[in-house]
Amino acid sequence: MMLHAQHMPGQPGAPSLVFLHGFSGDCREWQPVGEQFHGCSRLYIDLPGHGGSAAIPVGGFADVIRLLRATLISYNILKFWLVGYSLGGRVAMMAACQGIPGLCGLVVEGGHPGLQNERARAERRLSDGRWAERFRHEPLTEVFHDWYQQPVFASLTAQQRQALTALRSQNNGETLAAMLEATSLAVQPDLREALNALAFPFYYLCGERDSKFRALAQEVAATCHVIRNAGHNAHRENPAGVVDSLAQILRL
């Protein structure tokens, strides 16, 4: 089994870029950024529970990474960079720490390296469980209206919240809930030590108004690029800034 994806071929010898979206996004999320790198091969993946992969069930990160590997093999992508936002960033970090073959570099935007104690994990398990129940049983427009009131999204304008709520409400609540539980921070290990031991380039992107993730970026051995005029979802709020950072990272 493999994940649904959109593949855009590039020039021979150029890097292959594999893009992983955030929770409730899909393969279109990174395209405004990725399509600025038309010389590179670009693979935009739908994670389980999302988009064209909505019907693919997973029990945890191990299943997600197994599906990611199978998808890369199916497209004959043997050497690549992983670029992931939020949930996609956490999947990318997990894959990197588990030694996914062919990985040349890692770029994470607003991805959490992991909670550091059992109390925090227990609190997160309860919180994600409550959200999952809402995704299963309530209209998605109502759930996402409240979702985007969370402190991490404080930099969004009312208009941006409204647009995101309308976009994300096109998802399937049941499959979103299942993926939320399977990949919760409550079940993710603390990756700091493993990330600090990576033998390939690791870069971290965060919006200048995203104080929580700017602080987390200092806890991992990554080169940090701060994206101006952006909050947690920097590639949506300032795509040109993220394109500039990726161009510097990839030396294109």
From Swiss-Prot:
Pathway: Quinol/quinone metabolism; 1,4-dihydroxy-2-naphthoate biosynthesis; 1,4-dihydroxy-2-naphthoate from chorismate: step 3/7; Quinol/quinone metabolism; menaquinone biosynthesis. Its EC number is 4.2.99.20. GO terms for molecular function: 2-succinyl-6-hydroxy-2,4-cyclohexadiene-1-carboxylate synthase activity. InterPro entries: AB_hydrolase_1 (IPR000073), AB_hydrolase_fold (IPR029058), SHCHC_synthase_MenH (IPR022485). It comes from the Bacteria. GO terms for biological process: menaquinone biosynthetic process. Keywords: Lyase, Menaquinone biosynthesis. It catalyses: 5-enolpyruvoyl-6-hydroxy-2-succinyl-cyclohex-3-ene-1-carboxylate = (1R,6R)-6-hydroxy-2-succinyl-cyclohexa-2,4-diene-1-carboxylate + pyruvate. Pfam families: Abhydrolase_6 (PF12697). Signal peptide: none annotated. Transmembrane segments: none annotated. The keyword Lyase applies. It is an enzyme of class 4 (lyase). Belongs to the AB hydrolase superfamily. MenH family. HAMAP family: MenH. Catalyzes a proton abstraction reaction that results in 2,5-elimination of pyruvate from 2-succinyl-5-enolpyruvyl-6-hydroxy-3-cyclohexene-1-carboxylate (SEPHCHC) and the formation of 2-succinyl-6-hydroxy-2,4-cyclohexadiene-1-carboxylate (SHCHC). Monomer. This is 2-succinyl-6-hydroxy-2,4-cyclohexadiene-1-carboxylate synthase. It comes from Salmonella paratyphi A (strain AKU_12601). The gene is menH.
